Amino acid sequence: MPKRKDIQKIMVIGSGPIIIGQAAEFDYAGTQACLALKEEGYKVILVNSNPATIMTDKEIADKVYIEPLTLEFVNRIIRKERPDAILPTLGGQTGLNMAMALSKAGILDDLEIELLGTKLSAIDQAEDRDLFKQLMQELDQPIPESTIVKTVDEAVTFARDIGYPVIVRPAFTLGGTGGGICSSEEELCEITENGLKLSPVTQCLIERSIAGFKEIEYEVMRDSADNALVVCNMENFDPVGIHTGDSIVFAPTQTLSDIENQMLRDASLKIIRALKIEGGCNVQLALDPYSFKYYVIEVNPRVSRSSALASKATGYPIAKLAAKIAVGLTLDEMINPITGTTYAMFEPALDYVVAKIPRFPFDKFEHGERQLGTQMKATGEVMAIGRNLEESLLKACRSLEIGVCHNEMTSLSNISDEELVTKVIKAQDDRLFYLSEAIRRGYSIEELESLTKIDLFFLDKLLHIVEIEQELQMHVDHLESLKKAKRYGFSDQKIAEIWQKDESDIRAMRHSHSLYPVYKMVDTCAAEFDAKTPYFYSTYELENESVQSNKESILVLGSGPIRIGQGVEFDYATVHSVKAIQKAGYEAIIMNSNPETVSTDFSVSDKLYFEPLTFEDVMNVIDLEQPKGVIVQFGGQTAINLAQALSEAGVTILGTQVEDLDRAEDRDLFEKALKELGIPQPQGQTATNEEEALEAAKKIGFPVLVRPSYVLGGRAMEIVENKEDLIEYIRTAVKASPEHPILVDSYIFGKECEVDAISDGKSVLIPGIMEHIERAGVHSGDSMAVYPPQQLSKQIQETIAEYTKRLAIGLNCIGMMNVQFVIKNEQVYVIEVNPRASRTVPFLSKVTGIPMAQIATKLILGQTLKDLGYEDGLYPQSQLVHIKAPVFSFTKLAQVDSLLGPEMKSTGEVMGSDTSLEKALYKAFEANNSHLSEFGQIVFTIADDSKAEALSLARRFKAIGYQIMATQGTAAYFAEQGLSACLVGKIGDAANDIPTLVRHGHVQAIVNTVGIKRTADKDGQMIRSSAIEQGVPLFTALDTAKAMLTVLESRCFNIEAI
C-alpha cells in the first residue's frame, strides 16, 4: 500500500528527560522516526523537553519545540501548528500517556487529529490490565491468574485465595514503577498502597507469581496489510521476577527447542495481529523450564528499550520502519537498509551471540537498595557481540566500566561462603560476579540452578570460563591456551593477571604469533546476502570482513553506557563530531558499546565498531584502520581515561595533548598553571594519606571540600566540617581511586557558574556563561542553570571571559573546554577545568545556535576560529532566558537520599525558555514535574545556619497565601522573628509528623536543608523519602525554593485592602 497522501503534517511526541526506565533509546528511536518521515516528504513537528538529545536538533524535524510535555503546553503547540496526525509510539511511556491525555481532554476529536501507528484502543488494551486480560482470554493465550484491584483490601482478599508469592503491577506506569513481588501480607499492603498512588488510573494488577520461569521476549513488527514478522527473539539470563531492563539478556534465544521457539513466536504474532498494532511491539513471555506451559506477561505497544537492543543486535532499523508503517507503507514494499536488496519483510537471522548487561548507579549510591525485582533500577546498558556466548558475555563485562576486565571481582575472594550463597539467591545488580565466584569455589552448577532458577546452560557457560582460567594457570606462556582464551573473549589484561605478567607482554606475544582479532559484519542475514553496512564486531577467527579504506580516517571514541554523571549529552557531542569529520572530507569511525544511542546507529558514521572501550579493544581497531588520529574529547571521562595509554602506544591524540590534559587533571600541575596565569582558586592541597590530609585541613581551615582526583560527576566528593568527619571520609572514601591522591580544598560558599569554551590554541570562543541557581556545594549537574546570567555584573562576566581565555591558551587547549567558577564578594575563583566536552554542550549549543561540537572538531582538524567566521571572546547574548533543570529518578531507588550535595544524583535534564526569567522557570519546573499549587501548606525544616534566610522565604510564601508549617526548632525561630507557623510533630508522632501529613495529602511542598556538616540525619532522610514517594515537591537547597517562589509570585495578583 503506498504512503498516505491525505496527511501532510505530523507531530512526533518525544519521551522527555532521561530517567531510570526511559533512557537514550528514545532519542535514538525518535531521531530515526523524524528523519524517516521527512524522507517520505512529510512536514514533521517535534515536541520534547529534553535539550540533551540529537532528536531536539533543528535539522531533525521541520520545527522543533523544546517545551514541557504537559497537556497545557502540548495543547498550545497543537493549536498553533494544527498537525493532521500525531505519532506517539516513539516517545516511550511519556508519549503514550500524552496521547491518552490529549484524547481524554477531547483535543484530538475537537481538532480532528488522527493518531498514527497504534490506535488508542490498542494502547488501552495493552496497557489497561483488565482489557488486556480479556483480550488474552479471547485469544486463548494463557496469563497468570490475576485480579484488578482499586484498593488494598481487594488485593489482600485475592492473595489469601491463591496464596503467596504474588506480583503487583500498577497500570500505566513505566519501568515497573511501584510494582514488586510480595511474599507476605505486610509486603503486599505496602507495595499495593504505593502502586495505587503511582498509577494514573489508581489501578493495580495482582497476579500469581511465576518467578523462576524463563523470561523470553519477542520484538515484532506489523503493517496495515497484516504482514507481521519477528525481528529478534531474546532470552533473559535471569528468570522471571527481575525486570527485563535489569536482566542480562542474550539474543537470539539460547535454550529454547525449535518447538518452544515456534510456539512462542506464533503467540507473539497472534497477539500483535489481534491488537492491530501498526509498527513495532514487544511481547514478554514466561516459559516453564520443565514443560511446554507458557504465560504472556505483558505487551508494550510501542518502540521500547528492547527494540533499541533488537535494532542494534540485528541491524534491523525498527523505529525507522515503524514510522514508515505508521504512514501506510508496508513491510513488503520497503527495502531493508542493511542489505539494500532484501525487503523489510525478510526476518533477520543471526550468526553471532549478543549480550546485554545493565549498568547500575550503585557506584554513586552506596546506600541504595541493590536487590533487584520487578521495578527497574539500571540507568543504562552495554551490549557486546561475539561468536559464542562466553565471548559476548566477557566483552560486555569489560564494557561496563566498573573496574573489572572479566566476570570476576577480586574483592569477592574474601567474603564468607554464607554471604556468597545469600548474594547468589537474593539477586543484586552484581549477581553475575557472585555466581562466577561460587563456581570458582567449587559449587556445582546443579546446586546453583536450584538456588537461582537460572538455566543450567548459562551456568555451564560460566563454568566453561572458569575451566579456561584453570587451563591458563596450568599452561603459562602456552600458545594454544592463549588462542583458546582469546576465542572465548578473555582480555589480554585478564590473561596477564593469570600469568603474572604485564598486559603489554601478552599483546607482544599475540603480535609475535600474528594473533589478531578479525572484524565481522552485522548484516541481518547470517551472510546469506551481500550487505552494505559498515557495522562490525571483533572475534578471533580467520576471515576479516572489515577492509581499511583508502581515505584518511579519524576515530572518535564514544562514552560507553549511560550512568549518572555521564549521560546522553556526551553521545550528542560524539554524533556532532562525526558530522564535522565527514564534512571535512575524512572517513569517520565510531567505537562505542551502548546499544541505546544515536552514535551506535550504523547510518551515522562511515564505520561503526561495537566494542568495549578498553585500551586493548581500541588498539586492535587502530592497528587495523590506521587512522590519522583519535578524538577523545567527546566521550566523557571514559575516553579521556584512555588518552594516556594510547599516546604512550604511539597513537596520535587529536586536539588538546595528553600532557595538557594532565595539567588540567593533576592537582599540582594545575595549581602551578593557575599561578603562572594569575588566576585565583580556592586554597587547597593534595594529600596521599591521613596525616597529610589532616595537616592540609588544619592549614586551610574548615570547612573543606575533599575529593579524589580524576573522577567524573563528583563521585565520593564531600564537604567536611571537622577533624572526625575528615578521618572517617579518608577511611571509607579514598578507595575511590587508590593510585591517585585526594584533594583538600577550602570550601567557598558562593555563587557558581560555568563556561564552555572552544579554542584553536590562539583564539577562544565563549558561547555563553551559565549561572547556577543553587550556590556552591551542589554539583553542577544537579543545579538549575540559567543562560544568559541574571545576577552577574558586566565586570564579573568580563573577568570570567578573560580567565577562560587565559586558561584555554595557557593549557594549549585545542577544541572544547569547560571551566567552573565560584564568585564570592565580587571575587572570581576557578574551581575546576575539564579539557573536554561537558554535559552542558547540547544545552548551550541549542540556546546560542552555535554547533559547538562541530566547531570544536573543525579546530581539532586544523582550522581556526577566524576561518570559520567566529570572533574571539564572549558571544553576544540571546534575547530569551533559558533554564536547564535537572531531573532525578529517586522514585525508582529505595534508600537513596535525595539531599543535593557535591556528588551528582540527577539522571537527566529538561529545558524551559521564554521571554522572562519567571516564565522560563515556570516551564522548567513544569517540565521536570515539580508542579506547585498556587496555595496550600508548606513545611519548613531548616538547619541553624540557614534559618535567617529561610525566614524571608517563609514570609514571601505566606504573602501569596500559603500556610506555613515548621518543625520545632524552625517554628521557634520563626516565632521569635514574628512569624507564626503551625508546629508539626517529631518523626514518630503518629498523628502529625511530616511523613503522616504528606501521606494524607496535607502538604503541598517541603523545604528541608541540613547544615554544612551534612550528617546523615535519619529523620531528615525519612522526611525527604516520604516527599519523593508521594510526589510532593521537595527543596533541599533554599535557592531552588526561591526560584519556585519567584514563579508563584509572578503568577499572583497583588491583593491589598485600601
Swiss-Prot record:
CDD domains: MGS_CPS_II. Residues 133-327, 671-861 form the ATP-grasp domain. ATP 1 binds at residues 129, 169, 175-176, 208, 210, 215, 241-243, 284, 298. Coiled coil: none annotated. Mg(2+) 2 binds at residues 298, 300. Mg(2+) 3 binds at residues 820, 832. Residues 402-546 are annotated as: Oligomerization domain. Keywords: Amino-acid biosynthesis, Arginine biosynthesis, ATP-binding, Ligase, Magnesium, Manganese, Metal-binding, Nucleotide-binding, Pyrimidine biosynthesis, Repeat. Pathway: Amino-acid biosynthesis; L-arginine biosynthesis; carbamoyl phosphate from bicarbonate: step 1/1; Pyrimidine metabolism; UMP biosynthesis via de novo pathway; (S)-dihydroorotate from bicarbonate: step 1/3. Large subunit of the glutamine-dependent carbamoyl phosphate synthetase (CPSase). CPSase catalyzes the formation of carbamoyl phosphate from the ammonia moiety of glutamine, carbonate, and phosphate donated by ATP, constituting the first step of 2 biosynthetic pathways, one leading to arginine and/or urea and the other to pyrimidine nucleotides. GO terms for biological process: 'de novo' UMP biosynthetic process; glutamine metabolic process; L-arginine biosynthetic process. Residues 547-929 are annotated as: Carbamoyl phosphate synthetic domain. ATP 2 binds at residues 707, 746, 748, 752, 777-780, 820, 832. Mn(2+) 4 binds at residues 832, 834. The keyword Magnesium applies. It comes from Streptococcus pyogenes serotype M3 (strain ATCC BAA-595 / MGAS315). Mn(2+) 2 binds at residues 298, 300. Mg(2+) 1 binds at residues 284, 298. Its cofactor is Mg(2+); Mn(2+). This is Carbamoyl phosphate synthase large chain. Residues 930-1058 form the MGS-like domain.
